[in-house]
Curated annotation (Swiss-Prot):
Protein's name in the database: Putative pre-16S rRNA nuclease
Similarity remark: Belongs to the YqgF nuclease family.
Gene from which this protein is expressed: yqgF
Principal place of residence: cytoplasm
Phylogenetic lineage: Bacteria, Pseudomonadati, Pseudomonadota, Gammaproteobacteria, Enterobacterales
Protein purpose: Could be a nuclease involved in processing of the 5'-end of pre-16S rRNA.
Subcellular location: Cytoplasm
GO annotations of cellular component type: cytosol
Amino acid sequence: MSGTLLAFDFGTKSIGVAVGQRITGTARPLPAIKAQDGTPDWNLIERLLKEWQPDEIIVGLPLNMDGTEQPLTARARKFANRIHGRFGIEVKLHDERLSTVEARSGLFEQGGYRALNKGKVDSASAVIILESYFEQGY
């Protein structure tokens, strides 16, 4: 086991991506993947998996603030199931509440409004999701 994990922040137009190391508990953003109504470029995901060879994949689970599911929750679950089904890698879902808010705030502090492009926000959210997963001791 390499201790490498990939995280995805699922969205219908853009899917944020991050790579992290279990040993350091840190993650960094990778370029976001464009999606067509929630359908990603599966060839690109396959290339990412071959390049990084993760032990496990984390997919952000979008929930309402009260913990209830929202319309995007089922689509994120479906995305996670498809990754597992296509590639046979263990996939876990992780609560992503407030990750986008935190990502926007951090990017704005670094570069103002110009830093807030969709792909950067989505991949920064994936970093937050993965680091949160590490912080919870997984």
